[in-house]
């Protein structure tokens, strides 16, 4: 009898203890802005929102609005799009999804076929919505990695999970700085580019304001005081250092011709937080202007499975030197190694007829496929990259590549066949600029005194730096193929 009672209790608990997706609160603001949120509950690990305006969803498609929210704020899991413009009478069709951990397993719970009719636009003052959220409909739990019916499988993966074709898998509009998505680097720059930079988190180098990310390079002496770069004492960035502890990324001591980096800047990435393989990346940004400054809009390998540095490749979404004689030339593509030939072999470029790429905002686009990479700017294709017969490894001798034998174990597109993460930053100097014979470049790349020589030429390059010497990023989007 006792066993029977226990069995009945467990059955009742299992039947009636099923998780229910919380009601979604929909708020539409004037003149623009859309916020959809659910209350936080213990066990919720992810909230996803997918929606369209005045168009019904085709099953669980990605939709016009599509985002995974990875962290609750102020007691709610919140999707917010500051640019969404809706009017009274519009209908928002949507579905939501929650990853829920019950103490043993993480299961996915969708809430399908929802709609919200806009009856009133709200001021951005936290006013209550005029329409009661729709009643939740129970749905059986599903594993998050299982593709739903009506979903066409994509070759794209995000964080090693399969996704639906055409789905928007990442969207950042910098409403706030999301530390659960972005990791600010705190380190001294080192290989493979040896830029003359000390990466810091926070002002004056890193700011998120007015829905834009701004990264600005600033001379180190202006931040820490005159003579900072050559003071004879050890500088240890631990425990905040994001580089390899104990290495020159975290600890440096000036002496003789060795100085600390003469420029402070910032670099953020989704390393360890979010990654993907294959897809369309779109970044709307204004590039920095000024001598020896360049944008760092990259895709870097997550695990460096083919080896350290460029042995595992890098995809450059947009690169343009800030010098007057370089800023008309936009370059993007695949970096195969640190030598000039390997840096240029799989890179495409487009030259602006007038003005520079840093004069205004542009859309920089990369379409990364298993056998091809397409480079675009403002929806114009300026290059396609294909692997040679035998793969990139077949060019090892011609390009003076080292430590690339592991590529033979990958696809013909190796090393560009592994998950990568996003990088946004600003670099200065280093090996990204080829040596010149006309003495207009104040250092040579293999000179151990290169950083000091750059610093000694500060009056020359500093005169070209201005308020335009900053990278401004409006948004970052990634969509599945």
Swiss-Prot record:
It comes from Tenebrio molitor. Disulfide bonds: none annotated. It is found in: Secreted. InterPro entries: BGBP_N (IPR031756), BGBP_N_sf (IPR043030), ConA-like_dom_sf (IPR013320), GH16 (IPR000757), GH16_GRP_C (IPR035806), Glycosyl_Hydrlase_16 (IPR050546). Belongs to the insect beta-1,3-glucan binding protein family. Glycans are attached at residue 467. Hemolymph. GO terms for molecular function: carbohydrate binding; hydrolase activity, hydrolyzing O-glycosyl compounds. Residues 211-481 form the GH16 domain. The lineage of its organism: Eukaryota, Metazoa, Ecdysozoa, Arthropoda, Hexapoda. Residues 1-17 form the signal peptide. The N-terminus is blocked. This is Beta-1,3-glucan-binding protein. The gene is GRP.
